[in-house]
Curated annotation (Swiss-Prot):
Species whose genome carries this gene: Thermoplasma volcanium (strain ATCC 51530 / DSM 4299 / JCM 9571 / NBRC 15438 / GSS1)
Record-stated family: Belongs to the universal ribosomal protein uS13 family.
Function: Located at the top of the head of the 30S subunit, it contacts several helices of the 16S rRNA. In the 70S ribosome it contacts the 23S rRNA (bridge B1a) and protein L5 of the 50S subunit (bridge B1b), connecting the 2 subunits; these bridges are implicated in subunit movement.
A GO CC annotation given for this chain: cytosol
Biased composition annotated in UniProt, kind: Basic residues: 142-158
Record's compositionally biased regions (Basic and acidic residues): 10-22
UniProt superkingdom: Archaea
Subunit structure: Part of the 30S ribosomal subunit. Forms a loose heterodimer with protein S19. Forms two bridges to the 50S subunit in the 70S ribosome.
Gene3D superfamilies: 1.10.8.50, 30s ribosomal protein s13, domain 2
Gene Ontology molecular function, alphabetical: rRNA binding; structural constituent of ribosome
PANTHER family assigned: 30S RIBOSOMAL PROTEIN S13/40S RIBOSOMAL PROTEIN S18 (PTHR10871), SMALL RIBOSOMAL SUBUNIT PROTEIN US13 (PTHR10871:SF3)
Protein name, UniProt field: Small ribosomal subunit protein uS13
One of the protein's GO biological processes: translation
Any matching Pfam family: Ribosomal_S13
Length: 171
């Protein structure tokens, strides 16, 4: 009889644990929306931010440190005001971080160092390519022709299109 009552006590304790855990997670958000993208609330702040195009893991850690947030804390555990502060900081293009950490340094029109995210980054990259094409720079011409831009080999690699096989010299 003693064993049966001990088992009942254990099962009662185990049953109480999940209920307590659910009570702790009342404010937990499983999806957090930042910069028009849904982020997984179960991931730590830097990892969740790295899901945004234009923010890597290192920048995610830097943003968490700048806003005095624990990098190990899950993004879904943040309070509403902390999430708003994070949204505002990420969507702001001018970060108060070192220049080498940003993805669009010395912007041609204003000369400022920016970090662009999501569609802003896509649009800016396309504008930069169009500017190179317009001014007929070497990189712009390579972009127009669909060739490799960054100095890679083209003789034996990256073949696509109509050519079939290797062209041999006639003897």
């Amino acid at each position: 009889m003693g064993k049966a009552s001990a088992n009942n006590v254990k099962s009662d304790k185990e049953a109480a644990k999940p209920a307590a855990k659910k009570d702790e997670n009342k404010d937990f958000q499983y999806i957090v929306r930042i910069a028009n993208k849904d982020l997984n609330g179960e991931r730590p702040i830097p990892l969740a931010l790295s899901d945004l195009k234009g923010i890597g893991l290192r920048l995610g850690y830097a943003i968490a440190e700048r806003l005095n947030l624990q990098p190990t804390k899950k993004i879904g555990e943040l309070k509403e005001d902390e999430i708003e502060k994070l949204k505002e900081y990420v969507e702001n293009k001018e970060y108060d971080l070192p220049d080498w950490l940003l993805n669009h340094r010395r912007e041609p029109v204003t000369g400022k160092n920016l970090n662009l995210v999501t569609t802003d980054l896509d649009v800016q990259v396309q504008e930069d390519i169009n500017l190179m094409k317009k001014i007929r720079s070497y990189k712009g011409i390579r972009h127009e022709k669909g060739k490799k831009v960054r100095g890679q080999r083209t003789r034996s690699n990256g073949r696509r299109g109509l050519s079939i096989g290797v062209v041999r010299k006639k003897e």
